[in-house]
């Protein structure tokens, strides 16, 4: 590919990613099918909707886009939702294993040539899943697809104990009305003995663009809380930069990580340095790095 063609393709890719941004109503639909065990009983299909979600570029460099999602609930409450970072020709991945443990993986320049990594983060900016793929622009279609392992989704992690890994094939497709996140998932029970697939699942999340006025409350909320979450991201980035495996302790004193970090929004000191120190203290308590006896952190 010539330099000009490569530059044009890169700009096409970035434009498609930015097309995910805006104010959206969303429908979420999931259904299980093809159980691998005849004794498995299919669970009821899942349906949910969100009246408004504000999605926007929070940071941008030549090869990176940080996109934050904010959920508007009942026109009165804002929920800091998930975040997705897009990195061009990224060579550093955190691959989910199981039991809140992610393995650091280095990729060669040959493997990632022309590819984008989508890094998906939880509401507290902790890792969720990461995958590589190539944006495709053909016949008026614009889409990206990747397969990667992930923790249980939020809709099931407190409801299910019969599987512990979801192998997700994610497909993001830009449409005239917004975008669609299609999923072909495998629900897997993973152990030292290997993987056992319980059932397949189809997911379809449809993002339909609505007027930005429906998301004004989210815009205002972010202006108030942006600086705090920039500090949180910076501390996570410092951990990721060490390029070591990561394990997150599920609970400390009956409090999960997101509760501890969200509490600091209002309770931390009023200077950036005090806030940063408080964030560092929380992360040091919950996050274990390296592979030395990491399973003890999740018992």
Predicted regions and their residues:
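Tryptophan-anchored aromatic micro-motifs
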Residues: 19-32
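Short helix-loop boundary/capping segments
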Residues: 113-167, 186-189
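Short hydrophobic/aromatic-rich beta-strand segments that constitute the beta-sheet cores
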Residues: 26-28, 66-69, 95, 118-123, ...
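Extracellular-facing segments of soluble proteins and assemblies that are Gly/Ser/Thr-biased and enriched
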Residues: 71-130
């Amino acid at each position: 590919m010539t330099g000009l063609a490569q530059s044009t393709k890169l700009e096409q890719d970035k434009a498609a990613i930015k097309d995910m941004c805006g104010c959206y109503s969303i429908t979420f639909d999931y259904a299980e099918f093809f159980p691998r065990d005849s004794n498995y009983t299919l669970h009821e299909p899942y349906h949910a909707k969100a009246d408004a979600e504000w999605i926007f570029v929070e940071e941008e460099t030549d090869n990176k886009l940080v996109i934050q999602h904010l959920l508007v609930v009942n026109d009165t409450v804002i929920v800091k939702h998930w975040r997705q970072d897009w990195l061009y020709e990224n060579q550093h991945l955190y691959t989910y294993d199981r039991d809140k443990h992610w393995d650091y993986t280095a990729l060669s320049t040959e493997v990632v040539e022309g590819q984008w990594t989508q890094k998906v983060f939880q509401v507290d900016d902790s890792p969720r899943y990461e995958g590589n793929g190539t944006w495709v622009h053909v016949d008026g279609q614009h889409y990206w697809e990747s397969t990667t392992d992930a923790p249980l989704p939020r809709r099931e992690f407190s409801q299910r104990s019969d599987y512990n890994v979801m192998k997700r094939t994610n497909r993001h497709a830009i449409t005239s009305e917004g975008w669609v996140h299609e999923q072909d998932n495998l629900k897997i029970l993973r152990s030292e003995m290997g993987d056992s697939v319980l059932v397949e699942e189809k997911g379809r999340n449809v993002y339909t663009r609505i007027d930005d006025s429906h998301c004004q409350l989210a815009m205002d909320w972010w202006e108030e809380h942006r600086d705090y979450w920039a500090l949180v991201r910076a501390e996570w980035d410092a951990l990721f930069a060490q390029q070591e495996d990561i394990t997150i302790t599920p609970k400390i004193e009956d409090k999960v990580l997101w509760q501890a970090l969200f509490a600091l929004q209002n309770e931390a000191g009023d200077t950036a340095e005090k806030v940063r120190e408080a964030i560092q203290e929380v992360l040091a308590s919950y996050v274990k790095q390296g592979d030395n006896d990491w399973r003890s952190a999740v018992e």
